Amino acid sequence: MTTTTTTTTNTNTTNLDPLLPWVEKYRPILIKDIVGNEETVSRLESISKDGNLPNIIISGPPGTGKTSSILCLARALLGANYKEAVYELNASDDRTLDVVRDKIKSFAMKKVTLPAGRHKIIILDEVDSMTSGAQQALRRIMEIYSGTTRFAFACNQSTKIIEPIQSRCAVLRFTRLSDSQILTRLREVVQIEKVPYTDDGLAAIIFTAEGDMRQALNNLQATHSGFGLINAENVTKVCDQPHPLIIKQIIALCAKSDFKEAYPFLKKLWDDGYSSIDIISALFSITKSSNNIPEYQKLEFLKEIGFCNLRATTGVNTLVQLTGLLSKLCLVSIKMKN
């Protein structure tokens, strides 16, 4: 694989602290810079142009840009008043009833001079981790200060937010980012940071990130700090996950019903110290994205991997279980041939 060294620079980041974590250094500033979830982002663009912000809930998996999107929207709406008119709180750290009564209520009461049609914004991250009592108190504050303050919530599961709050908000949903979206962003970062990389190295980072941009940038920076060169071997060492090439080899051999050849690869991963969950998760991810297996066979593979994962999560996570999984996959392939 050819190693690429990039030399391009980006004027937007040249004045930033070089020691700043890349996940913060490359956090979007404008709504148009947000990666992925185009439909939801376009709705945020419309809100920023219209200027009338409702209370909103953005739900979705970690690392998909929920909080960054809210911050971009707040900047677009408030401009120079951003610092004094925005209050950001991570509800997973400060989620008690006292925090709602003291910090949030005091900011909601605070008088800030804003242009007509603009409101103060309270941003609560991971609000789904707040206690029910704190959420009830929050609902009351939303009612009392609705004329001056808007609330923007980010969460992983909107179902954990009480119904009275949900009914007062517009709910927007984010999904995991696609591999191509993450790859595009990674290429931009390695160009700016002048990081030497190989294509298989970026592919390994995408594989370990599983649609999480924050995880992808953290893994990229950690690999660069530890080894300099971004290649598959170095990424695997840093992320401590089963090597994708070994997993692909296991799946390919099982697709050929070749248990005898597949088992040594599995045994090597086990001897290297990887847990059953590590190996099963890697098998699932690689199988799901494989284009070398017929669709029906892929579905049967995923079903057997899912059953094995169920047993592993209930405590039956031995090498025997993984060996049994290989035999099941090989049996599926034999049935397909017949």
Curated annotation (Swiss-Prot):
Sequence positions that bind ATP: 60-67
Alphabetized GO MF terms: ATP binding; ATP hydrolysis activity; DNA binding; DNA clamp loader activity
Keyword annotations: ATP-binding, DNA replication, Nucleotide-binding, Nucleus
Keyword Oxidoreductase: no
InterPro entries for this protein: AAA+_ATPase, ATPase_AAA_core, DNA_pol3_clamp-load_cplx_C, DNA_Rep/Repair_Clamp_Loader, P-loop_NTPase, Rep_factorC_C, RFC_lid
Any one GO biological process: leading strand elongation
One Pfam family named in its UniProt record: Rep_fac_C
GO CC terms: DNA replication factor C complex; Elg1 RFC-like complex; nucleus
SUPFAM superfamilies: P-loop containing nucleoside triphosphate hydrolases, post-AAA+ oligomerization domain-like
Localization terms from the record: Nucleus
Family: Belongs to the activator 1 small subunits family.
Assembly notes: Heteropentamer of various rfc subunits that forms a complex (RFC) with PCNA in the presence of ATP.
Reported function: The elongation of primed DNA templates by DNA polymerase delta and epsilon requires the action of the accessory proteins PCNA and activator 1.
UniProt cross-references to PANTHER family, sorted A to Z: REPLICATION FACTOR C / DNA POLYMERASE III GAMMA-TAU SUBUNIT, REPLICATION FACTOR C SUBUNIT 2
Official protein name in the record: Probable replication factor C subunit 2
Species of the source: Dictyostelium discoideum (Social amoeba)
Lineage: Eukaryota, Amoebozoa, Evosea, Eumycetozoa, Dictyostelia
